[in-house]
């Protein structure tokens, strides 16, 4: 071998290898101390880019999980508040049910209504004060609120919480048909009851026979109420226009084909003769008689079949001749406030025909709290007992007054100049002649009895306090009447359904959020695992590398030492 001093090739090789080993040893120490395989872009440029993207995704998913939990917190807050509102509505319905029986007096019903008013105030208080981070939840403003629940923009879940104030819930549809005076066979169909389909009911006969009439139709409708959402009630009542005065029925006097015969009765039916005679056959006729609080004769069909008076009931009963054959009024209730669409054949036989005047109104929970408007009251069926009437079919007032049953025919004692005042018996009765259509009926000022230029013959003072031109009057608030209590029950039931629907929507969104959170939690774990695979160091493998480069570093130092020692052999040649 040659001996050279200027260039120590062995030492240079040993140094070069030692530099490489030292660099790798530094990297290994850096990885072992940081726990990361990639500490700089130089370690793995593409791997670093992927790992950084995965780290960003994992962090964003973590915040998305927090967003979802915030959303669940908001919805749970609203849900718990509505749970309290539902308890309030349950109490309102219970109190309305308590008021819906004639064992209650006006005083006790007024007390119940006061309780209901307070409950409604608390219901509205909950709706107006429930909030989360300053945002009102139950006021109707929490609509289409978005929550980011993904790693990329616009990956959101929307949540809406409906308004729960008493003015926004409980919207119930009431429709009551005209009073029926002619029977017949009826085919009744509900149109688009679920938004798509029609529901066709069995044919029903409207008559005075057992198993017929509005009662039979209401029963048929109510069988499917859970499916259609429409319930029916009926009122078949014939009421005298004035307090009973002494008189007598004719020999052929009959109700629903059952002969009762001649009965003499006193003022106010003081001897009970008229009521007793009618009630003696009530199991056969289905018609029950009573004297109301104003002393008027009231005939009621409990089963809902018609009331047909034949023969002569007597002038003292003051039965409107138009009411001698009466099949009542049908009332429909729907718990969503939408129109009740019907079709069929012979609908005029149930008061819902094309030419019939149908009273209809949609009423919210809050509206049931105050005085019930006359038109709303009529739609609810308040006027089913003939409290106000249009007397038609007579060419003149005198023709009506001389008709059978009017109480003003010859010998009645109510002739001109008799000095007898019977206006109180007709406070809510309107007589109209020569009026070809409803538009010819005019409202008049209080007490005037006439309207300017109407060219109508009118009698019995038309009082504005009586309500509208059909003789329907405003009714007192809420449960202070039996009909009102029934209506509040319907409205409270609708309100409960409304809140249940809102809560159900909230619940479905909560479930959606929870499933999403579970999913993105798993995704976050997998993303972090993928990042770890790329970025984190494998300590077992790196420990082996460290041992390798540590040994190489030591051996490199030894090799450099030996390479330098070899050069000293040249000195021996110079000795």
Swiss-Prot record:
Gene name of the record: flaB
Family matches, as SUPFAM superfamilies: Phase 1 flagellin
A cellular component term, taken from the record's GO annotations: extracellular region
Localization per Swiss-Prot or TrEMBL: Secreted; Bacterial flagellum
GO molecular function: structural molecule activity
Subunit-level organization: Heteromer of flaA and flaB.
Known function: Flagellin is the subunit protein which polymerizes to form the filaments of bacterial flagella.
Main location: secreted
Family note: Belongs to the bacterial flagellin family.
Name of protein: Flagellin B
Keyword Secreted: yes
Keyword entries, A-Z: Bacterial flagellum, Secreted
């Amino acid at each position: 071998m040659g001996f050279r001093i200027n260039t120590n090739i062995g030492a240079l090789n040993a140094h070069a290898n030692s530099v490489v080993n030292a660099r790798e040893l530094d990297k290994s120490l850096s990885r072992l101390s940081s726990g990361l395989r990639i500490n700089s872009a130089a370690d793995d440029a593409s791997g670093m880019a992927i790992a950084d993207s995965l780290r960003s995704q994992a962090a964003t998913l973590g915040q998305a999980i927090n967003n979802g939990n915030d959303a669940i917190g908001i919805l749970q807050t609203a849900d718990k508040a509505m749970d309290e509102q539902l308890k309030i509505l349950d109490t309102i319905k219970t109190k309305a049910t308590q008021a819906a029986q004639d064992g209650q007096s006006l005083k006790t019903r007024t007390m119940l209504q006061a309780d209901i008013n307070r409950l409604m105030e608390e219901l509205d208080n909950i709706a107006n004060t429930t909030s989360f981070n300053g945002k009102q939840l139950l006021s109707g403003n929490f609509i289409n609120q978005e929550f980011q629940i993904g790693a990329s923009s616009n990956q959101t879940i929307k949540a809406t919480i409906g308004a729960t104030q008493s003015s926004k819930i409980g919207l119930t549809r009431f429709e009551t048909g005209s009073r029926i005076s002619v029977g017949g066979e009826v085919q009744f169909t509900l149109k688009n009851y679920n938004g798509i389909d029609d529901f066709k009911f069995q044919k029903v006969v409207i008559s005075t026979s057992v198993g017929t009439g509005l009662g039979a139709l209401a029963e048929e409708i109510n069988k499917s109420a859970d499916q259609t959402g429409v319930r029916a009630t009926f009122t078949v009542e014939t009421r005298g226009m004035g307090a009973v005065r002494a008189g007598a029925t004719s020999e052929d006097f009959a109700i629903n084909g059952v002969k009762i015969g001649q009965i003499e009765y006193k003022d106010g039916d003081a001897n009970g003769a008229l009521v007793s005679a009618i009630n003696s056959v009530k199991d056969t006729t289905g018609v029950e008689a009573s004297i109301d609080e104003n002393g008027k004769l009231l005939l009621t069909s409990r089963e809902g079949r018609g009331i047909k008076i034949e023969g002569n009931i007597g002038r003292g009963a003051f039965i409107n001749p138009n009411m001698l054959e009466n099949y009542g009024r049908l009332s429909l209730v729907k718990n969503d406030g939408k129109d009740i669409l019907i079709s069929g054949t012979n609908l005029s036989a149930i008061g819902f025909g094309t030419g019939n005047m149908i009273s209809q109104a949609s009423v919210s929970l809050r509206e049931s709290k105050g005085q019930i408007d006359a038109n709303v009251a009529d739609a609810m069926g308040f006027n089913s007992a003939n409290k106000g009437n249009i007397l038609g079919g007579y060419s003149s007032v005198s023709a009506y007054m001389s008709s059978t049953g009017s109480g003003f025919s010859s010998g009645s004692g109510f002739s001109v100049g008799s000095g007898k005042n019977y206006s109180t018996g007709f406070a809510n009765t309107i007589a109209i002649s020569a009026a070809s259509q409803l538009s010819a009926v005019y409202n008049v000022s209080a007490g005037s009895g006439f309207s300017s230029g109407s060219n109508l013959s009118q009698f019995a003072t038309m009082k504005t306090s009586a309500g509208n031109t059909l003789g329907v009057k405003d009714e007192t608030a809420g449960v202070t009447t039996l009909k009102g209590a029934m209506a509040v029950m319907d409205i409270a039931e609708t309100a409960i359904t409304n809140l249940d629907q809102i809560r159900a929507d909230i619940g479905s969104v909560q479930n959606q959020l929870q499933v999403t959170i579970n999913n993105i939690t798993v995704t976050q774990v997998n993303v972090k695992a993928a990042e770890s695979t790329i970025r984190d160091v494998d300590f077992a493998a790196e420990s082996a590398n460290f041992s390798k480069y540590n040994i190489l570093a030591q051996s490199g130092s030894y090799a450099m030492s030996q390479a330098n020692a070899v050069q000293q052999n040249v000195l021996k040649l110079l000795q």
